[in-house]
A protein has these predicted regions:
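Walker A (P-loop) ATP-phosphate-binding motif of ABC ATPase nucleotide-binding domains
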Residues: 3
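The conserved Walker
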Residues: 10
Length: 177
């Protein structure tokens, strides 16, 4: 477990899990949204090259595989995929609370971007995205995992928050021994 992707729908806790794994295993953490988003929510022109550079490193933990332009690179270079496959009823309260908190506090995200209440109506807003993409993203992951090109991946399929916490506790215990 040296090149780790954490996958799941928006709001599943990918970044939190990836940061925790990074700290526990002492591996570099890479936040994919920080590489993707430029000022004004634009795509950074360097995104593809940055991903290639990062994935050529001997070890990393990345918090998503979601951008289709780099999905193949990420899945082919990773050795482990942690799939946070929680039920919708566990996802939605998390993403709603996070979006409200970010809009109220004007939390600065990547390259000066921040969520606003005005953006809640946009189809790609995290709340709407998590709802509309729940089924399609699950199907995408199942299809990807049945692709022979990705048989090399060790897949850790965590089906609810409790299972994820238990798995992480075990990782922490093993990491200390």
């Amino acid at each position: 477990m040296q090149k780790i992707l954490v996958g799941g729908i928006t709001g599943s806790g990918k970044t939190t899990m990836a940061k925790g794994i990074s700290a526990r295993l002492n591996l570099p953490f890479v936040e994919i949204d920080g590489l993707f988003h430029g000022p004004g929510w634009t795509k950074r022109p360097e995104f593809f090259e940055d991903i290639k550079r990062v994935t050529d490193e001997p070890a990393w933990v990345m918090d998503s595989y979601g951008y289709s332009i780099v999905r193949e690179i990420l899945l082919s270079k990773a050795d482990t995929l942690i799939w946070l496959d929680y039920p919708r009823w566990q996802i939605m309260p998390r993403v709603i609370k996070r979006s409200i908190r970010r809009a109220v506090t004007k939390e600065v995200l990547w390259n000066g971007n921040f969520e606003t209440f005005k953006n809640f109506a946009q189809p790609d807003h995290p709340i709407r995205w998590a709802w509309s993409q729940f089924g399609p993203r699950r199907k995408l992951m199942s299809n990807l995992l049945s692709d022979p090109a990705y048989k090399h991946l060790e897949v850790i399929h965590l089906k609810n928050i409790r299972a994820a916490r238990e798995w992480f506790r075990e990782l922490a215990r093993v990491g200390r021994s």
